[in-house]
């Protein structure tokens, strides 16, 4: 399509579209002018900037970079344009409002760059002035620091290896039949094994050691779980109560339960008999305030 140029106020950069738009049609407060008027305006602009104006046939063309979203309504369309110069006579115009912004940014960037350069120079001069006259940093200083860091790393590594070797030697010296010490392929440390052994030795159930209570439990409970014919009994609530009563009597006969506990296992409470169901305590009803 033939490039149709769009001219705005002379103080604002020109815009153009690759669209078939009628001449003198208002498009976002811009007017679509003929190429001849655009060439005249470009000649005036180049004359102000002391630049040779281009020939009419070599004017700049415009193309749409971003397609409009609504092609039927040009009053609601925002287009992003890009200018293509055939002859580099005039600088490409910027979009509306970007010329001043770019100049401001460039000015700020230049000032920031100058400030950073001056700060670097000051720091360099101050660092030089702080050093005493005739003093230079030895060339081997960096090498010495690197060597010292390497030595520190080696010592730490050697210490870790020694500690690991001691741990391996201690675990291998343990007996193979450690029982609960080895759990899923893991071997406990000697301190942990001693602590566990002490806890097992001091564990008591109703005043009896663990092994004594287990023997008493099996002696009392096992016969009650089987019928005389050798078939297992079907568990019921009555059977559980009988087992509990027999086990309690056996503990009392062994002297494992104190006399006070035999009279009242729970002080301050009335214990139901073996054949009695515990009665739930009824809570008093709260009187609602009217």
From Swiss-Prot:
The lineage of its organism: Eukaryota, Metazoa, Chordata, Craniata, Vertebrata. Residues 114-130 have a biased composition (Polar residues). Coiled coil: none annotated. Residues 105-156, 259-290 are annotated as: Disordered. This is Uncharacterized protein C22orf31. InterPro entries: DUF4662. Residues 143-156, 261-280 have a biased composition (Basic and acidic residues). It holds the Pfam family DUF4662.
């Amino acid at each position: 399509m033939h490039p149709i140029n769009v001219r705005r106020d002379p103080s604002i950069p020109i815009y153009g579209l690759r669209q078939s738009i009628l001449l003198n049609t208002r498009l976002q407060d811009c007017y679509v002018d003929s190429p001849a008027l655009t060439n005249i305006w470009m000649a005036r602009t180049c004359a102000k900037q002391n630049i040779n104006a281009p020939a009419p046939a070599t004017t700049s063309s415009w193309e749409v970079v971003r397609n409009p979203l609504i092609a039927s309504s040009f009053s609601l369309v925002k287009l992003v344009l890009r200018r293509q110069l055939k002859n580099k006579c005039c600088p490409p115009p910027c979009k509306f409002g970007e010329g001043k912004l770019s100049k401001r940014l460039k000015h700020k960037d230049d000032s920031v760059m100058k400030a950073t350069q001056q700060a670097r120079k000051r720091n360099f001069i101050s660092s030089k002035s702080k050093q005493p006259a005739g003093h230079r940093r030895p060339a081997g200083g960096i090498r010495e620091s690197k060597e010292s860091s390497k030595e520190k790393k080696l010592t730490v590594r050697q210490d870790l290896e020694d500690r690991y070797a001691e741990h391996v030697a201690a675990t291998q010296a343990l007996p193979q039949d450690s029982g609960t010490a080895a759990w899923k392929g893991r071997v406990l440390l000697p301190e942990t094994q001693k602590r566990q052994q002490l806890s097992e030795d001091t564990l008591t159930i109703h005043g009896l050691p663990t092994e004594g209570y287990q023997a008493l439990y099996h002696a009392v409970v096992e016969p009650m779980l089987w019928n005389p014919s050798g078939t297992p009994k079907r568990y019921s609530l009555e059977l559980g109560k009988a087992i509990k009563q027999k086990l309690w009597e056996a503990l009392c006969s062994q002297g494992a339960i104190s006399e006070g506990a035999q009279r009242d296992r729970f002080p301050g409470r009335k214990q139901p008999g073996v054949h009695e169901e515990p009665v739930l305590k009824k809570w008093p009803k709260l009187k609602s305030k009217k």
